[in-house]
Amino acid sequence: MDKYIFKKDSALTADLCKLCIEYFESSDRKEDDKSRGYKGIAASLEFDTFTDLLMILNLNMQSYVDQHSYLTRLYAPWRVDNVFNIQKYEPGYAYVEEHMEHGKDRRDSTRLLGWMAYLNTINNKGGTIWPQQNFNSSPKEGDLYIWPAGWTHSHYGIAAPEETKYILTGWCSFVGVDNT
């Protein structure tokens, strides 16, 4: 772990990554959203479709908590949100605006952690940069990242100039809000 950014190599199997991409491509729930620097297509899903993914995330969240025991002593319980996104970025596109996962609306304001998994390997650029930590990720199929949702871990994507990038992304939030 580097600067509270947890990385688990190959957390997702190649088969699970392929299944997620195939599900995304066949989904009628895709939305093309170009607001706030986001240039890609997303589909919001629930874990009842991907129970293996929820088990993998919970296992890795426990590893994150084991390294940061304060997370067990917070004033309210929290867990992996039931909803997550599959996102597709065509060559030359990325979420280029620096942003954080914690936000101002009711749902976003309860976020404690963000997570992201790469569904395919990108050979030229295509990663994510956390500028305040001077940390760059390299997109490798199955790799999972977990980080704090607040302003200290703002981040942005780098476009892959020649390859299509697929990611999963979601959050851990305090329990008792509509998205948990």
What spans do the regions from the language model cover?
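Fe(II)/2-oxoglutarate oxygenase catalytic core
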Residues: M1-L144, T152-T180
